[in-house]
Each structure stands twice: as C-alpha cells, then as structure tokens.
C-alpha cells in the first residue's frame, strides 16, 4: 500500500491521504478510516488513480458528499476516492447543461433556477453530489434524475470512458446500471426547460421549506434510510409501529420523520446498524413486510 501511495503522489493525481477518518466525509458524521484517500484533481487524475488501482489489484470505492452511505466503524480497506472540487465543472448550453460529478445537487438546483431553467426543482434539499444522484437515481417531489438525464459520462475500471444514454443507464426506483456495474459517473448532461424565473424560484423554495419543516436537518443524517415499500411509505409504517424517537446508542429514529436516523452526537455505525435491524424486525413482525434499505452499507464488518 505504501508503494501505491508513493505512485499516486508521484503522478500528482490530487490529494492523497493515509488513514483518513471517513466521519469527516459523510453526512452522518460516522465512519472509520480509509486506508488510502484520494481527491482527484480532475478526470485525468481519476483515470490515473484507477489505472494504478487496477495494476495493484487493491479494493476501491468512490464516494461523493457522503450522503446515503453508512461506513462501518472499521472503515474502508484499499483506496477510497472522493469526487469533489476537481470534478465540479458546469457548462450551460441553452436548455442543456453539462455538470461534473462533484457538483452539489442543492447548489446546482439553485444556480440553474437563477438562469430561468426548470426541471431541477425536485432536487432542493437532496444532500448529495451529481455523481451520487445519478448513481442512485435520486428523486423527490414526484420526479427524479431519470426524468432529466440525457447522458452520463462513465469511467470504467479498465480506463475506458463512455457516454451512456438514459436508456442504457437502466434507471428504476432509486436504482441505475452503476449499482450493478463498476462504472463511475464523472459528469452528466441534463435536459431542462426554459421557464419563468420567479415561478421556478417559488417552486424551489417551496420544496426547500417542505424539507426543512418535515425532515431533521438539525442533526447529522444520511437522508432517507429505507426505500418506500410502494404503495406504502417507509416513514409512515415506522411511525405506525411506534418507533419514532427509538434510540440505540447515539443513533435515534427522528421524531420529525421516521424514515430518518439521526446522529445525536456520538453515534457509531454499529448503533445505526442495530437500529436498522430493529426497524426491519419490527415491521416484519407487525406488517409482514420486508423493509429494504436505501442507504448503502459499506466497509469492513
């Protein structure tokens, strides 16, 4: 691993850190150390990082802003790559925008609204990055990424870069092709529509206000923990089961919205995991329903 670190630094791929606490890089503020942590300077830096990883055969993982993931207390082995400011470019071409994977979704929705472009209002309050949003087909308020994505620029582990169409991305509810294949979305093209700036601004603010009033943004959280077992809603089921406010260690089911687990200050991944299992067991016993997690559980157990 030391040789890999030296090689990464010699190639000047970006920031390279050793034993970096992932609690600093997740919205839950939870997670053990990454053996090697890389923040690429650009797409070329990411390509060179992946080339070295393939040559050494070590494990790897890509993260964005760290939402929608639960990193174990033991952390991640191998190389963790964070797509951040090196991949946060934005180009507007009429009603089409090309945006880097590291661009924050909330910021994008705000910036685009000021230019009179509609279609991203649903993303107000989504805590992740563009890359993560594409990866999981993030959505809210009746829309999702699949409704606006034209193409995704994907880097595969063998170093090839390909533009994948919306159809090739195989989107479904909170799912995309990238969850089944080892591709990394490095940028995306979204197709938006021209609209009235004031109308777009009002809709965006309405969605932001809804999230602020109904979801617990005063504590670290990852976003929604469970997928909605349609036509039911996960939060409503958990609340009906009497689990609002239930706490294990430093992890608590939010008293505002039961599909959120908050870090009250000193939560460990083990606390959150125990709480997730308790919810699943309770819902299974009371309603004979299997609750699937929307949050991804990663790292050494």
Curated annotation (Swiss-Prot):
This is UDP-N-acetylenolpyruvoylglucosamine reductase. Residues 29-195 form the FAD-binding PCMH-type domain. Gene3D superfamilies: 3.30.465.10, UDP-N-acetylenolpyruvoylglucosamine reductase, C-terminal domain, Uridine Diphospho-n-acetylenolpyruvylglucosamine Reductase, domain 2. GO terms for biological process: cell division; cell wall organization; peptidoglycan biosynthetic process; regulation of cell shape. Keywords: Cell cycle, Cell division, Cell shape, Cell wall biogenesis/degradation, Cytoplasm, FAD, Flavoprotein, NADP, Oxidoreductase, Peptidoglycan synthesis. Cell wall formation. Pathway: Cell wall biogenesis; peptidoglycan biosynthesis. Its main location: cytoplasm. Its cofactor is FAD. Its EC number is 1.3.1.98. NCBIfam families: murB, PRK13905.1. It catalyses: UDP-N-acetyl-alpha-D-muramate + NADP(+) = UDP-N-acetyl-3-O-(1-carboxyvinyl)-alpha-D-glucosamine + NADPH + H(+). One of its GO terms (cellular component) is cytosol. SUPFAM superfamilies: FAD-binding/transporter-associated domain-like (SSF56176), Uridine diphospho-N-Acetylenolpyruvylglucosamine reductase, MurB, C-terminal domain (SSF56194).
């Amino acid at each position: 691993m030391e040789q890999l670190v030296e090689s990464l630094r010699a190639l000047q791929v970006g920031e390279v850190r050793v034993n970096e606490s992932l609690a600093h890089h997740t919205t839950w503020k939870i997670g053990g150390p990454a053996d090697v942590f890389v923040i690429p300077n650009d797409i070329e830096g990411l390509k060179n990082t992946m080339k070295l990883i393939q040559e050494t055969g070590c494990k790897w993982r890509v993260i964005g802003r760290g939402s929608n993931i639960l990193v174990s207390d033991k952390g991640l082995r191998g190389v963790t790559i964070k797509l951040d400011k090196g991949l946060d470019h934005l180009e507007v071409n009429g009603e089409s925008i090309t945006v880097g994977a590291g661009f924050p979704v909330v910021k994008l929705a705000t910036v685009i609204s000021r230019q009179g472009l509609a279609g991203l209002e649903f993303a107000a309050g989504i805590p992740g990055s563009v890359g993560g949003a594409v990866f999981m087909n993030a959505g809210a308020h009746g829309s999702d990424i699949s409704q606006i994505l034209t193409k995704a620029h994907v880097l595969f582990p063998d170093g090839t870069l390909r533009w994948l169409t919306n159809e090739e991305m195989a989107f479904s509810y909170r799912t995309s092709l990238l969850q089944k294949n080892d591709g990394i979305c490095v940028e995306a093209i979204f197709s938006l529509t021209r609209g009235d700036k004031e109308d777009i601004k009002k809709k965006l603010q309405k969605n932001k206000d809804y999230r602020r009033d109904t979801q617990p943004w005063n504590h670290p959280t990852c976003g929604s923990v469970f997928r909605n077992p349609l036509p039911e809603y996960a939060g409503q089921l958990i609340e009906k089961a009497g689990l609002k406010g239930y706490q294990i260690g430093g992890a608590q089911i939010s008293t505002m919205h039961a599909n959120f687990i908050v870090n009250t200050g000193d939560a460990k991944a083990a606390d959150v995991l125990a709480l997730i299992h308790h919810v699943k067991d309770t819902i299974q016993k009371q309603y004979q329903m299997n609750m699937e997690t929307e949050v991804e559980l990663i790292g050494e157990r």
